[in-house]
Amino acid sequence: MNITFIGSGYVGLVSGIIMGYLGHNVTCFDNDDVKISKLNKKILPIYEAKLDEYLKQALESDRLKFTNIYSNDFRNVDAVFITVGTPSKELGEADLKYVYDAVDKVSKHINKDCLIVIKSTVPPGSCNNIIAYLKAKGFSFNVASNPEFLREGSAVEDFLYPDRIVVGVNNQESEALLRTIYAPLIEQGVKFLVTNLVTSELIKYASNSFLATKIAFINEMADLCEKIGANIKDLSQGVGLDQRIGRNFLNAGPGFGGSCFPKDILALNNLVENYKIDCKILKSVIKSNKLRPGNMVAKIATLLDGDLKGRNIAILGLTYKAGTDDVRASPAIEIITILLNKDVYVKAFDPIGLENAKKNLEHKNLLYFASAVEACESVDIIVIATEWSEFKELNWQEIYDLVKSPMIIDLRNILDNEVMKKIGFRYYAVGSKI
């Protein structure tokens, strides 16, 4: 099949590259000239495990190309996937201006039988509104919904071996075309769920909001564990081993971040409020997560006897989770911002996300370092803010000899308490009593 992706950000890029690898002829479009130039030279603008290998294979097989030009080549396309961003407006509502801009432009270049597939995360009802919008302009394209469920850090595996493929359609032609596109995965036994447009759109919001709820819940259980002496790791395992619940997203920490969970739960809350539904769960999760970075700073302050001003603090990990270079809505960045506002000197390190962090946050009291060891030199406390496996392998004995005060607060519970204490550190983790 001939497929085009409009928007070569995280979703469009991963989806387009893997679709090319699966045997389709793929064109990825983006307005960013520099990005397109780099992609044509096999240079990825994002970090994603194994994606560079698939990019190379797809390009060498001549099944993938990148462009910044809307051209007549689009007239031979069977399906156009819209994968542009849908950022939050001030009150949490999804901003669809990039979606409509993409729809406007492609509608002028594609053939009448081309299927427009909305892969961007959009509020329920959006596809029907787009159909009406196109009809008012004299177009009668089929429009389908096909939400993505890719996790940054494991997106390639998620695309190739998904739990399910969800499509929302309003006719058999659209369903048949999407079945053909996803045939390589369906033939492997992947569940292909067909529903209507609105339900498909809502599935994405409901899924992400439910996962965010699991994270907020286990974080609050960690707070209880601190008070009563329970073990949060054992609690997470004991709860997660129940197959009705599952073990994923039950790791206590500094809160959820990234480009999806915070945005999507806000958008879903905005949607239910528009329909005069008082969804207390969503509001509670949003509030709980918003307070989480501040709560982490309060724990740091307690360990430093309530005196933060002028302290030197090392922050190890800047991305919102391991396996990605994405610092959007990162709890680590939120924590650093709060600390800087309290006149703290911050020394920061991340194995992958350093450059993105530098673009996101600059301050006279914030220094970025090329190694964790350098960042820890002469600090009053070390904060593990992201669960990078590299941090487990650090020479902690060397770091112990360099710090001003041998104290660690592990916001991701990745280090071994006994090992750290044997070296000589005062070690505290989320869910343990301070």
From Swiss-Prot:
Keywords for this protein: NAD, Oxidoreductase
Top-level taxonomic group: Bacteria
Protein residues bound to substrate: 148-152, 204, 208, 249-253, 257, 321
Uppermost EC category: oxidoreductase
Known EC number: 1.1.1.22
Positions annotated as active site in the UniProt record: 260 (nucleophile)
Name of the protein this chain belongs to: UDP-glucose 6-dehydrogenase
Species for this entry: Rickettsia typhi (strain ATCC VR-144 / Wilmington)
The keyword Transmembrane is annotated on this UniProt entry: no
Residues holding NAD(+): 2-19, 30, 35, 121, 152, 263, 328
NCBIfam families for this protein: NDP-sugDHase (TIGR03026)
Pathway: Nucleotide-sugar biosynthesis; UDP-alpha-D-glucuronate biosynthesis; UDP-alpha-D-glucuronate from UDP-alpha-D-glucose: step 1/1
A GO MF label: UDP-glucose 6-dehydrogenase activity
Catalytic activities: UDP-alpha-D-glucose + 2 NAD(+) + H2O = UDP-alpha-D-glucuronate + 2 NADH + 3 H(+)
Keyword Secreted on entry: no
Protein family membership: Belongs to the UDP-glucose/GDP-mannose dehydrogenase family.
Gene Ontology biological process terms, A to Z: polysaccharide biosynthetic process; UDP-glucuronate biosynthetic process
